[in-house]
Amino acid sequence: MHRVFISYHHRLDQGYKDALCRWNEQHHIFIDESVYDGDIDDTNMTDDDIRKAIRDNNLRKSTVTLLLVGQQTQYRKHVDWELYSSMYDAPINHRSGIVVIMLPTTGCKCTFAGHDGEIYSVFRGTDWQTNNLLATNSDYQNHFPYLPNRIIVNLMQGAKISIINWDDLTPSRLTTLIDNAYNDKDNTTYIFPKMRRYNYNPQ
């Protein structure tokens, strides 16, 4: 089993995170490393200071990040920091693989096969997409509503990130997605748009 960090909107999507952890306890899919020690006070911190704090503390033991995407996940600065830090390949704490889980609140119906063979091993029978089928930022937004821009711009550059819907999860599918993310994490090149420094609350 791989060590996994779960990134999500704590106020709105805690119930899904708790449900995923209970499900994992039943099926023994991953080792949960998502310890939450409270928000980081980023006053007077540079982007690199934040990245080091997240990577060296919150993500230190994990090798794969599971991102739970709800309607407001993309607006949370701490989620953006966790994604940035997961993608960053530091000398001591190396980059992580990433798997995206679209929550029912997004209304998403599509999946994304980010790794070789997943169309058949994971996404057979679903409305799957690949980089060959999506060309623009708008294409990704239309197929995957509420997906954070940091994920979109990296998918557009060919990053090996898979996307599955909450309702399509099975133990075998999630195990395969985590394994693939781990196995390809050192073969993925990420790009790093500027980190979000403020939360935005549309509602």
Located regions from the model:
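Glycine-rich, phosphate-binding/catalytic loops in enzymes
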Residues: R22-N24, E82-S86, G117
